[in-house]
Amino acid sequence: MLTLFSYFGFLFAALTLALVLFIGLNKIQLI
């Protein structure tokens, strides 16, 4: 159970980081 929770936590963190990088690149291109 704890392993499954850790896996989803890691996946959520990876998706969040990817989203932040994607938004950051878009802001750089808009400037």
UniProtKB/Swiss-Prot annotation:
Q: What biological process terms from GO does the record include?
A: photosynthesis
Work out whether the entry's keyword set contains Cell membrane: no
Classify the source by domain of life. Eukaryota
Cite a GO CC annotation: chloroplast thylakoid membrane
Which GO terms of the molecular function aspect are on file?
electron transporter, transferring electrons within cytochrome b6/f complex of photosystem II activity
Query: Could you list the residue ranges that cross the membrane?
Result: 4-24
Q: Name the Pfam families on file.
A: PetL
The signal peptide, as residue positions, is none
Write out the annotated subcellular location. Plastid, Chloroplast thylakoid membrane
Keyword entries, A-Z: Chloroplast, Electron transport, Membrane, Photosynthesis, Plastid, Thylakoid, Transmembrane, Transmembrane helix, Transport
How does this protein lie in the membrane? Single-pass membrane protein
To which protein family does this belong?
Answer: Belongs to the PetL family.
- Quaternary structure (record): The 4 large subunits of the cytochrome b6-f complex are cytochrome b6, subunit IV (17 kDa polypeptide, PetD), cytochrome f and the Rieske protein, while the 4 small subunits are PetG, PetL, PetM and PetN. The complex functions as a dimer.
Function comment: Component of the cytochrome b6-f complex, which mediates electron transfer between photosystem II (PSII) and photosystem I (PSI), cyclic electron flow around PSI, and state transitions. PetL is important for photoautotrophic growth as well as for electron transfer efficiency and stability of the cytochrome b6-f complex.
Q: What is the protein name given in its UniProt record?
A: Cytochrome b6-f complex subunit 6
Q: Which organism is it from?
A: Anthoceros angustus
What is the name of the gene encoding this protein? petL
